[in-house]
Amino acid sequence: MILIDSHPQHDWLVGAVEKRLREELAKRTVEINEEKSKIVDLAKGGSFTFLGFEYRRILGRNQQWRPYYAPKLKKRTALLAKLKEIFRQNISQPVEGVIEQINPILRGWVNYFAVGASSECFSFVRDWVEKKVRGHLMRARERSGLGWKRWRTKWLYEKLGLYHDYRLRRLWSLRKVQPAPTVP
């Protein structure tokens, strides 16, 4: 993935970058797959997917255009299908065992997609998982509903140990390491 500014004065860069890329790859006896390679103009509303993320350009709060990348809907759907299968296979098992199985999957998926604009997707996944756990608990007690009055959300995460670290990791928010002071 190579990103180039869309300003008209940089139009010559597209050809130059492609030429240089072909030269460098030829040194390593690697060729560009023309079927998989494409040039996308994000300034004209284009978007592309790469490594499970969808990339496009949006207008930010400060009225400046900025890149936007979030998990693909297909990846979220695949995660939910996998979790649904675990709930289905363990329908008569205690909820603690189900949570032990889904927590590593959730942790890995969230850690991978914890960059970019993933909070809306994380919120959906968290709500979906919470409803499935509540439904599992109610089914074990042969009751209908989701037990909103019976169990507080805090109880699900603290007592049962349901995965709850759906925070985004922003690279720019990490503290910069200060160099060690030099002694004269």
Language-model features: locations:
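Non-catalytic terminal/accessory segments
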Residues: 1-184
